[in-house]
Amino acid sequence: MKHMIQPFGIDMYTKVLTDTKSSKHMSFYEADKSGMPDNFTISFIPSYTTEWIICYNDDNDKAEFICAGSQNKLTELSLNVFDHYFGVRFDNTGCYFNKGCNSKTYPVNIADNVFRYEPATDSYEMQLIKDFHKSLTFKDRVALFKAFATDCKTFCPVSESIKKLNSLIYSGAGTVSELSAESGYSVRHISRLYNKVYGIGAKDFIKMYRFQNVLAEIIANPDRDNSFFIEGTGYSDQAHFQREFKTFTGTTPKQYIKLIKNF
């Protein structure tokens, strides 16, 4: 069984605890081995956000940190067997990097990459694992991770120009031409800005944003007809929506809805 991990689907698996409210720029989720099938594989739906998954055991210091940058295509990842999996989904306002990094280090630096490593004995990451061992609740671990990110990493925000452009997209700009007209930037300059920060063009960013919003509606209202989901979203017709859905998820809307209903 494959489970989709993306901003609006992190709570699709019945055994997963989630927290999307306590932090402005992060969503948290947690699952343990008892709720997972063997040979567990997760699929990252194309997105402009980054993901960390911390895998650890109860009775030893064996652990693995997984950092997945923004993905331009559907990406599958097999998880090694651990007692617990603690995940963090960051939004598109920036990334956390190691202390001392250049403040203009953007998400593009890890785009389309998945980094996996075991924490060194005296590292900040190993101390976080030890703190997780002593924690009692999911809420405790969320607080511990937030402190870890603040104290041991550097948050590098996206540029002010990108913040402005993203805000226009959130407000309804559905094409690069509309974005250009509303921002005063040329189409070419906008594309350069998005590629510099995210490693994707503005057109692809808008596609991802549109699709994630539609996916949120599907998860919230799986019994609705497809026409309800795509109304006013920029899809030209059902065929356009079906093609993009297949590209992003590797499946059809009908199959996807059946999948989430079975969770």
Describe the predicted segments one by one.
Residues 101, 196, 217-220, 247:
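Residues within well-ordered alpha-helical secondary structure of globular protein domains
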Residues 176, 191-196, 203-206:
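Long, low-complexity intrinsically disordered regions
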Residues 1-163, 168-177, 183-187, 201, ...:
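Alpha-helical bundle regulatory/interaction domains
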Residues 205-208, 239:
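Conserved structured core elements
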Residues 194-200, 244-256:
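A secondary-structure capping/hinge motif
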